Amino acid sequence: MAHNIYENVVLSNKVNEILETKVNLNSYMTIDTTLSANAGNKIKVNTYSTTSGVEALSMGEGNTKDIEVNFTSKEYEVKTYQGRFAFYDEQEQADPMVVDTGLDGAAKDMINQFNALAIAEMDKATLTHEATAWGFDVVADAIAKMDIENEAGLFLLVSPADQAAIRKALKDNLSYSEGFVRTGYIGNVCGVPVTTSKAVPSGKAYLGTKEAVTVFIKKDTETEYDRDADTRANKYFVRKVGVVALTNAYKVVKITIGA
């Protein structure tokens, strides 16, 4: 049996197809590719917030305070996220699905890595909401804390461990939209799609829009193949180079249940 070797461009397309099928990162994070045009391995990210300053005034009165713009600046280091899949010719000869299965696993690991990074950034949210148990009011109150007029684009990420409790608590308030198909999707509440992610710890949830977290891509999905002809050992490398950062602290609410 001749050995089946993928060209790198074919391999890259296969991995990208898997990534797009498993999860659409654009739904939960903003993708920024400006790093690819700039030299250097560090990026300074400013996270902005504003103070309230609108007041009810009587005739002749003026404002007693200003609306202020504040920001915190943090330097991030660009990192390489890489997965390696290895197998021997004999393994593929015994089971032709070895390569496709390995690529699927590498893509899932990449997804899990970026999801975990995004959740870690969301956990830095300045807007928080605490509740003793799940309920319709938990989501409604969290939305109110965002103080936004247009709720389109909101999502709620929860832990799979809390899925049963959420279903029981929300009951008829949890509706299903056939137009919203995502891995882990369990329904809508207050018009917001609820999706599970293994990166979310039990007892926590994150309500937000994709403007909260930005993925700064230095290099998009890159693949590389290496083979030792003597031992018939094959290695496929899948990598992305970039930074995941919280860029708008007012576009995400950290919900803590059981507080």
List each model region and its residues.
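N-terminal "assembly arms/tails" that initiate or stabilize quaternary assembly
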Residues: 1-71, 213-224, 230
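Extended oligomerization regions of viral-like shell subunits
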Residues: 39, 137-140, 144-229, 240
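Short helix/loop capping segments that flank catalytic or ligand/cofactor-binding pockets
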Residues: 53-56, 95, 165-168, 245-247
